[in-house]
Amino acid sequence: GLLAFPRV
């Protein structure tokens, strides 16, 4: 995941 996104 990225800084502003959940780890999906």
Swiss-Prot record:
Modified residues (Valine amide): V8
Domain of life: Eukaryota
Entry keyword Secreted: yes
GO cellular component, one term: extracellular region
Pfam family, any one: Periviscerokin
Subcellular location: Secreted
Range of residues in the leader sequence: none
Tissue specificity note: Found in the abdominal ganglia and perisympathetic organs. Sometimes detected in the subesophageal ganglion and thoracic ganglia. Not detected in the corpora cardiaca, corpora allata, hypocerebral ganglion or frontal ganglion.
InterPro entries in the record: Periviscerokinin (IPR013231)
Keywords: Amidation, Neuropeptide, Secreted
Any one GO BP annotation for this protein: neuropeptide signaling pathway
Family: Belongs to the periviscerokinin family.
Function statement: Mediates visceral muscle contractile activity (myotropic activity).
Protein name: Periviscerokinin-2
Organism, scientific name: Schistocerca gregaria
